[in-house]
């Protein structure tokens, strides 16, 4: 199966297509990190796209025991080789269940995000590289105490489901754009729709031509309405429905001790 509706004809346009089917689900992001480090260190101009495992449910077994910093957590061993979906047997969606889920989720983030970047930043030559990192959707971790089984993609999503990280990391020797110039204006005012125009501008395409067809890159004021589409129109042909994100109503977790946040 190919991600994001990619077909075989499009796959043929990729010079090197890598999958880690024989690697344990838990270790696939680390395999991706190792491959990214290899490519960063080969001193060749390349466009690299990585679909990470990340912290998609089920999150019971997506981290090693050494990264079980948050406890108590979901029972281990049932989903060791399940990448992106799973049965909910034994999970009733009540307050106590979500306490366990949030701890397992945070442990997974420590491993598949924290350790991933720790390795890339330590071993990869980023001096002439530019990395854009994001996630495909946010999560309803039921921090309001609301019962339920879904973390995302329901018919009536909470606003947290539309919140994702959007990070640009540029190497010290690479001269592209002044990313800080629009940071204040664009922080919490940008979306996935700004990523593709940004890539085109990095490739040298004319800004006016990009904006007229694809919209604004992150190098200019994006003016994004800060909404997210919660209908799967791209996949199912439905008309998109947009929900505004009010940052004043977002629930955020409490600050963890530094030792816990570092996975120690």
What kind of region is each of these model predictions?
Residues 1-92, 163, 191-192, 197-205, ...:
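Active-site-proximal alpha/beta segments of enzymes that process anionic O-linked groups
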Residues 23-30, 99, 103-110, 186-193:
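Soluble non-cytosolic domains of exported or imported proteins
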Residues 34-37, 75-131:
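A long, amphipathic alpha-helix that forms part
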Residues 38, 118-128, 139-141, 145, ...:
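Membrane-interface soluble catalytic domains
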Residues 47-54, 106-109, 130-135, 168:
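Short beta-strand segments
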Residues 54-57, 137-141:
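Feature marks short, surface-exposed loop/turn motifs that line or immediately flank catalytic pockets
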Residues 157-163:
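Short Pro/Gly-enriched coil loops immediately N-terminal to beta-strands
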């Amino acid at each position: 199966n190919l991600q994001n509706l990619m077909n075989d004809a499009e796959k043929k346009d990729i010079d090197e297509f890598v999958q880690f089917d024989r690697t344990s689900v838990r270790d696939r992001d680390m395999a991706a990190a190792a491959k990214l480090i290899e490519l960063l260190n080969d001193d060749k101009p390349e466009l690299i796209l990585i679909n990470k495992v990340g912290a998609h449910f089920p999150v019971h077994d997506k981290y090693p025991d050494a990264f079980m910093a948050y406890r108590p957590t979901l029972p281990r061993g049932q989903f060791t080789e399940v990448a992106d979906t799973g049965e909910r047997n034994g999970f009733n969606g009540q307050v106590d269940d979500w306490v366990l889920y949030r701890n397992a989720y945070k442990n997974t983030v420590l491993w598949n995000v924290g350790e991933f970047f720790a390795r890339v930043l330590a071993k990869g030559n980023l001096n002439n590289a530019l990395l854009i990192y994001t996630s495909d959707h946010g999560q309803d971790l039921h921090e309001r105490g609301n019962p339920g089984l879904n973390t995302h993609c329901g018919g009536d999503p909470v606003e947290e489901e539309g919140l994702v990280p959007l990070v640009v990391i540029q190497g010290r020797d690479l001269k592209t754009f002044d990313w800080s110039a629009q940071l204040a204006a664009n922080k919490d005012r940008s979306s996935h729709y700004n990523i593709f125009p940004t890539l085109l501008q990095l490739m040298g395409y004319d800004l006016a031509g990009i904006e007229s067809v694809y919209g604004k890159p992150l190098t200019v004021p994006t003016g994004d309405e800060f909404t997210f589409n919660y209908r799967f129109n791209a996949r199912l042909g439905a008309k998109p429905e947009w929900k505004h994100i009010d940052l004043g109503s977002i629930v955020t977790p409490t600050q963890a001790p530094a030792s816990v946040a570092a996975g120690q």
